[in-house]
Amino acid sequence: MVEMKFAVRPERETPSPPAPPAGYDEPKLFEYPTLVLLLVSVPLFLLTAYGFGWLLWQIQGPEVFATLFAVTETGDSTVLVLDMIDVGLPFVVALFVTVAVHELLHGAVMRYYGQDVTYGVNLAMGAFYAAAFGQFQRREQLFPIGLAPLVSIAIGATPLLAVPVPSIAVTAYMVLVINTTGAVGDLYVVWCLRRMPEGTLMYDVDLRHMYVFEPLDVEV
């Protein structure tokens, strides 16, 4: 008789947060509702793609989309074929550059507030990141930290929709769609922060574990 043994892989322990500072309550684990955010990102993508697409159409006219589609007329019909070579490469470049700049802007604002910033790429999560691990971050500072990439890239890229060079205008359109859709997590954090009392602190242990420390002297 052959005896078979199976090793049970232990569950990964949640890293412990630091002790609460004087005047603060015990920490609470902050978690992203990943599935909900993925679902919300779909209509956000569609709304953003339509909104900036409409703006691009109004500024440049339909001719700008000739850089995206090859038009073939056959008899009484017109066929639009998406050129994956001319569109795919700029999209991939725009994706990586936008994500990298997005995180650099997060980090720039963190540094402005005197925080030590760690940049990196997490292949398991498929994400670039900028984080202030092992440091308390004030609620009031996290608003500009969270919104800086969304606002800055929108301000910088929107005027490029009017550049009379279709490849530049279309790339700017891609950047706007990617950046706005990718900010869904930032928008969720900002929404949560608005519901927290002034003086609240947040603390990143690692990429997956963030803790919230609320002050004890909160007036109800």
Predicted region positions:
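Metalloprotease/metallohydrolase-associated module, dominated by Zn2+-dependent proteases
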Residues: 2-60, 125-220
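Short pre-active-site segment immediately N-terminal to the catalytic Zn-binding motif
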Residues: 81-100
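Active-site recognition of the HExxH zinc-binding catalytic motif
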Residues: 98-115, 149
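Membrane-water interface of transmembrane alpha-helices
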Residues: 108-121, 191-194
